[in-house]
Amino acid sequence: MIDDIAVPLTFTDAAANKVKSLISEEENTDLKLRVYITGGGCSGFQYGFTFDEKVNDGDLTIEKSGVQLVIDPMSLQYLIGGTVDYTEGLEGSRFTVNNPNATSTCGCGSSFSI
């Protein structure tokens, strides 16, 4: 876990509060939000979010408001400088990634290229 040093990724209050709410609904305080990148989507890479009880060797863990965001080292290299947020709007509610490393994104924002 990172404390008081430069964190390479921002985990917003909105995202942390939604994670806290979802963990409460599941009644499992061991859950953490894992963000990862896989190949696919219309732009080459896509973001994924899942709840995970494990933190693997090499994972980066960012804690906010009593909940944890976990990123594997391979995904982190594509996410440095980014922001994990939670938004609600006309397209529905979802976790999002604002990624300054992406050179282009698809219309829905779920895939990107570098």
Curated annotation (Swiss-Prot):
PROSITE patterns: HESB (PS01152). Pfam families: Fe-S_biosyn. Keywords: Iron, Iron-sulfur, Metal-binding. Iron-sulfur cluster binds at residues 42, 106, 108. GO terms for biological process: iron-sulfur cluster assembly. Its cofactor is iron-sulfur cluster. Required for insertion of 4Fe-4S clusters for at least IspG. PANTHER family: IRON-SULFUR CLUSTER ASSEMBLY 2 HOMOLOG, MITOCHONDRIAL. Belongs to the HesB/IscA family. NCBIfam families: iron-sulfur cluster assembly accessory protein, PRK13623.1. Homodimer. This is Iron-sulfur cluster insertion protein ErpA.
